[in-house]
Amino acid sequence: MTGYFLPPQTSSYTFRFAKVDDSAILSVGGNVAFECCAQEQPPITSTDFTINGIKPWQGSLPDNIGGTVYMYAGYYYPLKVVYSNAVSWGTLPISVELPDGTTVSDDFEGYVYSFDDDLSQSNCTIPDPSKHTTSIVTTTTELWTGTFTSTSTEMTTVTGTNGQPTDETVIVAKAPTTATSSSLSSSSSEQITSSITS
C-alpha cells in the first residue's frame, strides 16, 4: 500500500503496528518509501524502515511496535506499507499518534492521500522542509527595582532542533516592582514562546 501522509502540524509522529501476523514494514519519506510523484514506480530497495515487524515462525506476535518520524506541516510524505501473510489468519492494525496525543487507527481519511504519477508535473520537485530556517521569538517579563518599564531586544542565530540555523529573537521587558501583582506573574518571570517557519 502506498500513499502520501500529510501532517497537520510540525512535530514528531509515531506510527505503530499493534499486532503483526506475519510480517510488515512501514517506510516514511522520499528515498525510503518511494520518490515524489513515483508512487506506482518499481520499489526503492532501501532497508531504512520506519517499522520492521516480523512474527517468528511458531512464535508470538510482536506487540505494539513503532517508529517515530519528525515531519513538517503542509508537506506530503511518501508512505509505504509492505505486508505478507503465511498460513491462515493474518492481521495488521496500523495507527499513528499525532503530536497532540490523538491516535488515528486504520482509517486515515484526511491524513493519507493518493495521486496519479506524473513526473512531468511542475510541482513534483519539492524542497526539503528540514532545510528551512526557523525563527523563534521569546518574550520575558521581569520585575526590577527601577521606576520605569524597560524593553530590550537581542537577536542571535542558534542551531535549531532540526540541526539548521535558527534565528532567535529574545525580548525582555522589565517592569518596576511597584506594579500591581495582578498585572504580572507572581513568579519572577513569565515566558511566552512561539515558533514561525519561514
From Swiss-Prot:
Signal peptide: none
Gene3D superfamilies recorded: 2.60.120.1560
Domain PA14: 1-110
Coiled coil: none
Pfam families: Flocculin, PA14
SUPFAM superfamilies given in the database record: Anthrax protective antigen
Biological process, per Gene Ontology: flocculation
Family the entry assigns: Belongs to the flocculin family.
Protein name as it appears in the record: Putative uncharacterized protein YAR062W
Lineage: Eukaryota, Fungi, Dikarya, Ascomycota, Saccharomycotina
